[in-house]
């Protein structure tokens, strides 16, 4: 690759942005500059990788992309922990995917072909895996099993965590609304289920491991059956989707500026999309009351949800109307789990070697 030294760095970045994620891994050893580039948030956001949906049935996992037509691809499952699926949940951790099972979880980067099995704590209570927090390539898993627990990826150890919060009476609506943004976890919380003024976002950070009230929401749920889903917009801000159970009206709000993780007081929400046409689908099925998954692509809203028979659908909305709806026919098993995911270059964190752990303890 000596001839590449004569190319402008901007051109090298453009070339590399078109290389598939799995192929980029081998180029980390070319130079320190290249290795640093693959960890750079701007490069990752500009890389030709777009949002897609991950769907998991009892026997298979699929990637569903929209570029520009819907493409369904079955993902290989020859990795430890996923030989037999039987998943309880899929958790999108921004850069990694967590596949939750009864007896633990698999942290997985499907595009790099890397995975790691996370054994649950010795407590025999079922664990709810909420997501991953990180800082400077150090990672922790946040879970709940009667009390909050923190798993350290480096030491491979679970720690019971005494919950600290600025408002201990705040309840989490749904653990699936947890969102990972730049290393922190955020939840939609409420004081009264059907009081829109009581809804806000709680944050759990890596450094202090404390739950704090972060910012208010522009609206809440008026009915128990309303869809209310927090998401990530443009890689550094929030989005919030709501669908009214009664009118079927869909609203999407986004934050105007990048999220300042130290202070949520300056968060300003604005209406980004509104859909109120009569043919809008029900995004929350009435059988299992599961929230939809969604992402924003340009001026389009792309949603994945299940109908009342358990079949998966992709809805594309834009220009104040429903543009298309497509049933994913090849996903045969009903009631698939689903979440959004962006193919990433982030490796699955490995445990420290014994020598490194000894140095950390010193």
Curated annotation (Swiss-Prot):
**Disulfide feature:** none
UniProt domain F-box: residue ranges: 1-47
Q: Which SUPFAM superfamilies match?
A: F-box domain, Quinoprotein alcohol dehydrogenase-like
User: So which domain of life are we looking at?
Assistant: Eukaryota
Read off the Gene3D superfamilies from this record: 1.20.1280.50
Give the protein name, as stated in the record. F-box protein At2g14710
Annotated organism of origin? Arabidopsis thaliana
């Amino acid at each position: 690759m000596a001839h590449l030294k004569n190319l402008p760095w901007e051109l090298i970045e453009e070339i590399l942005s078109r290389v598939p994620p799995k192929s980029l891994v081998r180029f980390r050893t070319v130079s320190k500059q290249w290795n640093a580039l693959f960890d750079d948030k701007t490069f990752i956001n500009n890389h030709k990788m777009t949002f897609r949906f991950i769907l998991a049935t009892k026997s298979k996992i699929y990637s569903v992309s929209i570029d520009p037509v819907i493409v369904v691809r079955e993902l290989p499952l020859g990795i430890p922990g996923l030989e037999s699926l039987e998943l309880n949940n899929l958790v999108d951790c921004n850069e990694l995917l967590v596949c939750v099972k009864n007896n633990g979880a698999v942290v997985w980067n499907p595009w790099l072909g890397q995975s790691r099995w996370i054994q649950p704590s010795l407590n025999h209570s079922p664990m709810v895996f909420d997501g991953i927090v990180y800082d400077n390539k150090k990672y922790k898993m946040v879970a709940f099993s009667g009390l909050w627990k923190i798993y350290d990826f480096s030491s491979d150890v679970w720690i019971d965590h005494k919950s600290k919060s600025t408002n201990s009476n705040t309840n989490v609506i749904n653990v699936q609304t947890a969102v990972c943004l730049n290393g922190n976890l955020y939840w939609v919380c409420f004081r009264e289920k059907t009081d829109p003024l009581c809804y806000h976002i709680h944050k759990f950070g890596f450094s202090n491991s404390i739950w704090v009230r972060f910012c208010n929401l522009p609206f809440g749920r008026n009915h128990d059956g309303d869809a209310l889903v927090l998401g990530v917009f443009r890689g550094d801000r929030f989005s919030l989707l709501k669908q009214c159970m009664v009118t079927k009206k869909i609203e999407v709000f986004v934050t105007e500026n990048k999220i300042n993780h130290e202070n949520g007081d300056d968060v300003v929400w604005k209406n980004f999309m509104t859909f109120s046409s009569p043919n809008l689908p029900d995004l929350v099925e009435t059988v299992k009351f599961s929230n939809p998954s969604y992402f924003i692509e340009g001026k389009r809203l792309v949603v994945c949800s299940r109908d009342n028979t358990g079949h998966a659908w992709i809805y594309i909305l834009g220009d104040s109307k429903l543009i298309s709806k497509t049933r994913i026919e090849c996903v045969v098993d009903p009631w698939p789990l689903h979440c959004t995911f962006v193919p990433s270059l982030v490796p699955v964190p490995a445990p420290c070697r014994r020598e490194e752990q000894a140095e950390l303890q010193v």
